[in-house]
Structures are given as C-alpha cells and as structure tokens.
Amino acid sequence: MSDNRRRRREEDDSDSENELPPSSPQQHFRGGMNPVSSPIGSPDMINPEGDDNEVDDVPDIDEVEEQMNEVDLMDDNMYEDYAADHNRDRYDPDQVDDREQQELSLSERRRIDAQLNERDRLLRNVAYIDDEDEEQEGAAQLDEMGLPVQRRRRRRQYEDLENSDDDLLSDMDIDPLREELTLESLSNVKANSYSEWITQPNVSRTIARELKSFLLEYTDETGRSVYGARIRTLGEMNSESLEVNYRHLAESKAILALFLAKCPEEMLKIFDLVAMEATELHYPDYARIHSEIHVRISDFPTIYSLRELRESNLSSLVRVTGVVTRRTGVFPQLKYVKFNCLKCGSILGPFFQDSNEEIRISFCTNCKSKGPFRVNGEKTVYRNYQRVTLQEAPGTVPPGRLPRHREVILLADLVDVSKPGEEVEVTGIYKNNYDGNLNAKNGFPVFATIIEANSIKRREGNTANEGEEGLDVFSWTEEEEREFRKISRDRGIIDKIISSMAPSIYGHRDIKTAVACSLFGGVPKNVNGKHSIRGDINVLLLGDPGTAKSQILKYVEKTAHRAVFATGQGASAVGLTASVRKDPITKEWTLEGGALVLADKGVCLIDEFDKMNDQDRTSIHEAMEQQSISISKAGIVTTLQARCSIIAAANPNGGRYNSTLPLAQNVSLTEPILSRFDILCVVRDLVDEEADERLATFVVDSHVRSHPENDEDREGEELKNNGESAIEQGEDEINEQLNARQRRLQRQRKKEEEISPIPQELLMKYIHYARTKIYPKLHQMDMDKVSRVYADLRRESISTGSFPITVRHLESILRIAESFAKMRLSEFVSSYDLDRAIKVVVDSFVDAQKVSVRRQLRRSFAIYTLGH
C-alpha cells in the first residue's frame, strides 16, 4: 500500500517539473542533486511523529531558487569589498550636483513646500482613481503569470503619469486650486464663519494671490504705482512696516476689505507674507535685514470712542482715539519658542507664543519624559512688547461721566511711538484675555479686553480732510473752510470774535480779549534748532468773588479743542505735572502724566490758583515757560511735553482786591510765576448805579430769552395791560410810551446786528482751524515802537514797584500780535495787530497798579492806546 502511494507521488512530481516554462533555465543545485528527485521516503521528509498519513509539503520552487542563489557575505573574502579602488571609487560628474546652494528665505521655503505637498496629493489622487466595480472585477482576474490584473492596471497608471509631461507638469507648475477660485467666488462663503473660510488652503492661496496683485498693480489717478513707491521707500529706510490704506483696498477688492475688517488676525498673517514677497521683488536679500514685514492699516472708515466698544467688536478691526496716560517699559516677548529637554538634550519646537496664554510642554517627544524643560535662549525668537493706557480725550467725555480707558499692546516697531500726554489714533484688533484678578473681584467668569495695535499715529491738527467729516465737532468740511475765509474778510472780525467769547457774561471785555488771544495762540519758534520759544499765551484772572471768573474758565473748557480743568485745592504737584507709580502686573515703575501733560497742545485751566501751596506752584514753572516737564524719580529720567496755554483764576488776599495797594500785596504769588503770565486781568466789583442797572437788565433778558415759548404770552399780557391802562389814561400818553419803547428796542437790535456773536459751534471750528492752519509771520513791523514800549514799561515798573516787567513781556507783545493775525486768518502780522497787542499789554500793566498812580500811567501810555 505504501509502495503504491510513493509511486503515485513520484509521477505527480515529474508532471509538475514538465509543466515549467520552456524558457526557464535548467535548475542547478548544490551537491549536484535535484531535491525533486530525492527519495520521498528519506528520513528528512518523513513526519517525525511517525504518522504515515501526514507528510511535509513540497518546498515551493521560488523558495528553493532563492535559497540556492544566496551569497555568503561573511566568507573569508569579505574585507576585500571594503578595500580602496581609486579607479572605481569615483562618482559620475553628470550625476552629482556639487553647485553651491544658497539658503532659501522663509517665504521661498514655504512656497516650495506647498508645491511639493500639492504634487504628492496629485500623485495619490491619480493612483487611486478606479471605482469599486473595476477593483472588484480586476481582483477576480489573474494574468498568465498569476498576478492580479488590478496591480498591472495601477502600474500602467504610474507609467502613464510619468509619461504625461505636458499635462501633469503644467498642473504642478500652475496650482489648479488657484484657477478654481476667483475673486468673485470668495464672497460665496462655504463655512460656518469667515475665519474658517479664510483658513482653508485654497481660499488662503487665492487671498494671497489677490493681495499680491493689489500691492503690485494698484495705481493712483496719475497711473503711478502707489505701493511700489512705498515699498521702495521702505527698503531705503530699512523699515519693517508697510502702510496700506484701507480705502484703497475697499475700492480695488471689496471682499478682501470685508475679510480684513471681520477677521483681521488671519488676514494680517497672509498680508505680512505677501508684503515680504512683494518687497523681495525689489530687494531680493531684504530677509537678511528683517525677517518679517508688518502691514499697517490706515484710514479705517469707522472710528469708535472707548466707551462704544462692545462684545460685537471682539476679534474685529477697530479704530479709536484717546490720550496716552501711562506707558510701561519695553519687554522682550516670546514669539517662536524652543525648549531643551534636560534629560535627553533634544530641542522641542518651535512653538508659536500667543499673547493670550502661556505655552506649557507636557512631555518630550524624544524620551517621553515629563521634564524638566528649559527655554532655548539662542534659538528662541523674541519681539518687542509694550503696554500703554489709552484714555478718552478730555473734550470727548460726556458731561458728568468719568473718562474710560483701555490697555493697548504695542508690538515690534510700534513701541515708544507715543509718549504720555499725546493724543493718538490707534487701529488694532479688539481682543479679550483672561484676568484672574477680575474674576475674583466679580465672583463670576469675565474677561478683560485689550487692543492689539496694528498702527498708531499721533493726531496732528484736523483729520476731516482725509474723509472723516462729521465725526468730530472740531472737524470741518471744504464748505465750512470757505465760510471761514468769508468771515475772516469782515473788517470787524476781531471785535466780533471777542464779543462771541462767553456771550452769556456781561461786560469784562478785557478778560474776553485775553481769553480770545489765549485760545488762538501765537506761533512757536525754534531759533536755529537750539532755543525754542513758546507760542502759547498764559492768562491770570485776579479779582473779587462773584465776577464770573470760574464761568469764563468753564466756557473755555467747552470751547477749546483740548482742555483740562483742575482746581488749586484738588491738584498737587504730581497731579499737575507727572507721577511715577509701580505697575501692578510687572512690578516696575511707570510714568503717568498729570493735567499739564494731558493738556499738551491745548489749554490747562486752573481755578483757585491762589489756594495752591508754594511747592506745588513752583512745580509748574518749567511747564509755563519751557513747556516741558523733567522727571527724575525711581530711576526714571525723562522729559514730557507740556505745550499748553494756562488760564488761571485767583482771588486776592482777604477776599477782595484793595486798589490802594500794589498787586504784589494783593496776591500771594511770587515774581517768577507772575512774570510767566503774558496777560494779567484784574477784575474789581465796583459799585456803579448805571453799570449795575445795565448788568441787571442783561441778566434778566438772558433768562427771558432762555424761555422763548413765553414771549407770545408776555406780549399778550402787556397788550392787555396797556389796553386796560388806556381806558384810565389818555391815548396820547400811552402812544408816546409805546413809541419810546419801540425806538429803544430798535436801537438795541441795531447794535446787536452790528456786532452779532458768531455761533458757538462755528466759532469752535474757526478757532481750531486758525490754530492748526494759520502761522502768521512778522513782516515789515515797526520794531522801534515795540522797543520804546518795552523801555517805557520797564521804567514805570521800577518806579512803581508793583508789577515786574521782564523780557518775557516783550515776547508776549509779539505773541499777542500773532494771535490777532490768526483771528483774521492772515499770513502776516500787520501794524494794526501790533497796536492792539501793545494796548492789551499796557492795559494789563496799568490795571495792576494802585489807584494813586493809575491815572498818571494812563496819560503816559495814551500815545500807545488811543484809537484802539
């Protein structure tokens, strides 16, 4: 039985050997013995367990062939493979790229990575384009070699892919995703939010392409490339900020402007990369100077006040204005941070450091340990970081409200752009960040809000001409500017402006003249860049109580473009100048500006000036003349600008002014501070029956005019009373009284029409326009006359000894003359302006004298004051 079985197996083996392909070479095996012809019943082939029914499978032909073709690599000649052979150990020069490779820039490296990723994606897509039916059908088919048909089909597809140079290579060079999305298709948002839509790869590439075309192709009316010139200027100055006008982007590509307003953080990242690429077209090696270019957005159309910011503005672009009140030092902030694992020494990162949260490493990717980790100071990238406090400008705070403030973060080259006291305009991203102290204070989760500045500019003069009409009560339009010029051509414009100062206050023409001169101001000068001369006019109002001094100060506060009100008792030296306090977060000393610093390029109003102590008053000496405040406290040595006019009101000693005593004995002010006031107005509450009657009539009429709805009732009541009295009296007498009253009213109305006050809103804009646009020059003036006046004033001052006259008063005459020229919107100071200025200074000097010499001085200086 076993012999028959063995014979049958031998026949099967011979049949399988004959079935080999005829082209197959004859198989040679070690020992000259064919394993197929070996006896099956040999001990090597018998089941070791002795089971006759189970035998080992016959070895596969391929496996046997592989075993027979093996080469012993560990023989005695193995070391000869490593011996040097100079004839063969040479590389083919055609196959070796030994050219020097330049270091790629960050933008070029990202572009190549994106191209390689896209190529790999296309290869994967083409390799698996068969549908399921074809795969199932191919899996069931075998070729004559026994290989699945599907594999051969895929192999052919790879071969076709390599051979289709014209189609595939062109697709790799030109990104097909860029061709799929156009600028119009970007508006069809296919995501839950703008942020998700922008971060999609095809959308971000399309946005980058359109932004690049905008920077390279946008032209002005003359056909000149706007941003090409700015990029060249950026390269010449080695700057890292490129200013982009938002209105230009909105006109050229509106959908991108919408994305920028809604998702500024994502858009600015793309914009910065595009700006770097555009800059490298002009300066290929610019990345060696600055690794990044920051796009600064300007002229954003919507301006918010700090109190108008709400949760709907979070993560969007906002534009706010305010005054910088506090500024921290400059700190290095982590941007891209790398860590060293102290156990295995590997470097982890880089990780992008966001301003909202701190990066924490949980474990090392190399050794899987949980630390400790240390920041790699050499490979970590830092950037400048600074925080400033922005407060609402004094003129924009609603009545009865406290000014709001916000923290603003300045990064990169924006640090130290502004100083405390400067009014700035910030365009940035309104963000929220976690504040543990705020949560503990409120007892429930809330977030603090900050503004991450994108651009910051100091506000200089008017901004309405840039397209912001109607946003500010002090801005003007072109039509209003023509109205200003028309008003300035009036011969009596100076008297009309003086009459328009505090029209609800009767009389005090000298005070109104001084206030008008202070509001318009003179022209600051810088002599050869070495010595600066102030152009602001300081005024001191000294007089009896109840003479409307505080009312005039309040009027100036509402009229001036920028005014800060302070009182003598409530203001200290640091409150007026500057203070140094410790920052609660960084524990460093920071600088905060006082009232004079906040009133920079405006007016500082100080009531109850006599109530200040001498130490506090001496602190403003430097601010009144040099218009700067020097600080040297807590290791901070700096100088702050205080370019403002000071209008102060004070009461005399004892409550009332004594005309029999000189000025120095009526007020407890020292000569150094008195000499710093350009105009001194002494107000006396004298008893004059006629003047008191006119004052009472004016006050009553003011109250009556404030209730216009009662005019008709009052007229009807008067007619009724007149009718009843006509019955009792004769008609002739009544008619005579009515005619006399009518003539008196006509004379009063005619006088009011001759000098009608300018509307307050128009006057505010007129003053601001004159301060920012008009800079009159001293040309063809009678300087000898000024010299004579100064000499006469000095002589009389020494003889009377009541009011000191210094060289500052000589400069005051010129400043006041320039202010009168500004009232006329004139480019030159005329002799008429000079005569008015001399009269103001002389009257100020004479009124400060005691009554015994006042009349004599008026006669002495009549030659300078008559006719004005």
From Swiss-Prot:
Reactions that this protein is recorded to catalyse: ATP + H2O = ADP + phosphate + H(+)
Name of encoding gene: MCM2
Localization per Swiss-Prot or TrEMBL: Nucleus
Keyword Nucleotide-binding: yes
An example molecular function term from Gene Ontology annotations: zinc ion binding
Protein name: DNA replication licensing factor MCM2
Amino acid composition bias (Acidic residues), ranges on this chain: 49-65
Keyword Cell cycle recorded: yes
MCM domain residues: 493-700
Family: Belongs to the MCM family.
Species of the source: Saccharomyces cerevisiae (strain ATCC 204508 / S288c)
Modified residues (Phosphoserine): S14, S16, S23, S164, S170
